[in-house]
């Protein structure tokens, strides 16, 4: 009995917790041909103990979450300009992390490894080590080493884990099984889904061709070069010099990411983005009409009403932030909560084949994607792009009409 059992309810999330909890080290994590982290089991080492299966989302029956109206939702921004400018939205993830480190918590979060060009979960013991957690990383993270460290070394320590809902679900399951949940604070994000690593790899080839570089000191997935809110802008720096800033519109990576065609299969009907049963706090951008004119950055902080730890932690950081409480209708309806994406299986196969073909570039893949869209969809995107190129106040006004 292990994670290769076929009685599944869902697809693999690539959380990698199965490998971290395996007492026989019978599970290794590899990128599959489509660019997703997957477990590989050594049948000679596996003793069918079932621990891996006990933390796996594939076999979990997730009940419908009925307490949405009880959740505590806040629009929040750090008072510190340095924190806000160095983060993706309002800096609340960084503020919460700083508070937890100061309380003696180890903090687990995602950093971008500029040598390997991958996102990696690491364990931070100091404030300085946690600074690299700042900023969104819109690719899968290699979590195994950090999660293994939690399982082997830190179950009796105070630990805070920042991750996607599927990461937090798996950790929460294991901690409750071991009766160690009280030692932990779990914070997840409003998650759109994770794209294939093959998209990011081919995108970097495209960027390298523009910059004539192969590595960078700093990679930002969502720069505020044009302000917060309307634009997804990648930026690469080296030696303090900005070498690449993607355009406001038609960026190759974000075109494929937000097409939703190349997400991890578990993301299409993910139940975990629509529940708070495993997490203490959920954070993200505060989308919606309330802050359309804000260019600085506003975070959405959703505190689990049933989590005393979550409520206490938010109270402790209130002196470092500006905040305002909102009903769920102002914010959660603009997130991925409750969404189910359509799987375009044939197009998905063709786009993966294009990404795998060394004779083709990511520009070819994007061109093929748009050729697959209807005339109506292409015209709609052109209209959206036209609006985004207008002055920021005009963009905010037009969005407010929708």
Say what each PLM segment does.
Residues 1-2, 44-155, 329-349, 353-358, ...:
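Flanking helices and flexible, charged tails adjoining ferredoxin-like Fe-S electron-transfer domains
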Residues 137-174, 178-186:
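Conserved nucleotide-cofactor-binding alpha/beta core module
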Residues 17-40, 50-68, 280-281:
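Iron-sulfur cluster-binding cysteine motifs and their immediate structural context
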Residues 1-16, 26-48, 77, 247-255:
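Ferredoxin-like iron-sulfur electron-transfer modules
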Residues 103-106, 209-402:
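Long, compositionally biased charged/polar accessory segments in the mid-to-C-terminal portions
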Residues 10-25, 47-59, 164-170, 263-275:
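Local cysteine-cluster metal-coordination motifs and their immediate loop/turn environment
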Residues 87-91, 114, 161-171, 193-195:
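Gly/Ser/Thr-rich loops at beta-strand to alpha-helix junctions
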Residues 182-206:
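Short, flexible loop segments at boundaries between secondary-structure elements
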